[in-house]
Each structure stands twice: as structure tokens, then as C-alpha cells.
Amino acid sequence: MARITVEDCLKQIPNRFELALAATYRARQLAQGHTPKIESRDKPTVVALREIAAGQVGVEMLKKVPV
């Protein structure tokens, strides 16, 4: 099993706080049934981090959050 680390994700989103918000929002989307952008059997939080590390998802997720 490949491990995902925060350092891998920080290469894509340098701000830890934005990273946490983007990962949280994406994980919630995945938990609600949205289609993952990568192939994985992991839990939504891990899939969200893997998507961020792969560059499939970024800070644009924060622009979709309703205020």
C-alpha cells in the first residue's frame, strides 16, 4: 500500500490551511457519491488527498464552497 503524506500534497497546495479545507470539501463530495478522479478503494479522505497529490484537484475546490 502506497502511503500518502501531507508533504506530497503541499507540493500542489503550499498553504496547509487551504490544503485542509480543499481535502475536507473533496472528501465530503466523494462521501456523497461524486465520482473519484483516480482509481482507489480507499476511504474518501485518503482518495481526496491522493487526488490533490496527483494534481487532479486543487484550490479551485474552495471556490465551489457555498458561503
UniProtKB/Swiss-Prot annotation:
EC numbers for this chain: 2.7.7.6
Pfam families reported for this sequence: RNA_pol_Rpb6 (PF01192)
GO biological process, any: DNA-templated transcription
Reaction equations catalysed: RNA(n) + a ribonucleoside 5'-triphosphate = RNA(n+1) + diphosphate
GO molecular function, a single term: DNA-directed RNA polymerase activity
InterPro entries, per database record: DNA-dir_RNA_pol_omega, Pol_omega/Rpo6/RPB6, RPB6/omega-like_sf
Quaternary structure annotation from Swiss-Prot or TrEMBL: The RNAP catalytic core consists of 2 alpha, 1 beta, 1 beta' and 1 omega subunit. When a sigma factor is associated with the core the holoenzyme is formed, which can initiate transcription.
Name of protein: DNA-directed RNA polymerase subunit omega
Organism: Paraburkholderia phymatum (strain DSM 17167 / CIP 108236 / LMG 21445 / STM815) (Burkholderia phymatum)
